[in-house]
């Protein structure tokens, strides 16, 4: 019964769509469609499966909303969706879409641990 409730909650979280006010207008994205957020020139670039969009949000605000969907900060300018990480080599994170994102030295140990924990939980659920 409890596992069924958790599964329903996970499904509801996956189906959640978020509206973003961007320079192109309002767009809606599911968390799984977002590869990462990048802070650049006082704006946030939303890198997604539907393209790149520029919006006026803070990374702190986005992290608070998206950390429950397995988003983590690899660098002061990046928040990544752990689902879309292909591999980590040194201080470079290779994303499934082909982008390479930096991993800050001071965040490396904690980020790699969180990624490892995420992978462990993903394999247990299968």
State each model region's role.
Residues 100-105, 109-112:
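C-terminal structural segments of small proteins and small subunits
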């Amino acid at each position: 019964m409890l596992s069924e409730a958790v599964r329903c909650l996970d499904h509801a979280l996956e189906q959640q769509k978020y509206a973003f006010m961007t320079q192109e207008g309002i767009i809606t994205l599911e968390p799984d469609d977002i590869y990462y957020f990048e802070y650049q020139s006082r704006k946030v670039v939303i890198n997604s499966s539907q393209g790149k969009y520029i919006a006026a949000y803070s990374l702190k605000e986005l992290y608070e909303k998206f950390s429950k969907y397995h988003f983590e900060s690899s660098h002061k300018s990046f928040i990544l969706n752990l689902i879309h990480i292909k591999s980590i080599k040194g201080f470079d994170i290779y994303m499934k879409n082909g982008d390479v994102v930096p991993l800050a030295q001071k965040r490396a140990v904690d980020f790699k641990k969180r990624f490892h924990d995420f992978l462990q939980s993903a394999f247990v659920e299968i």
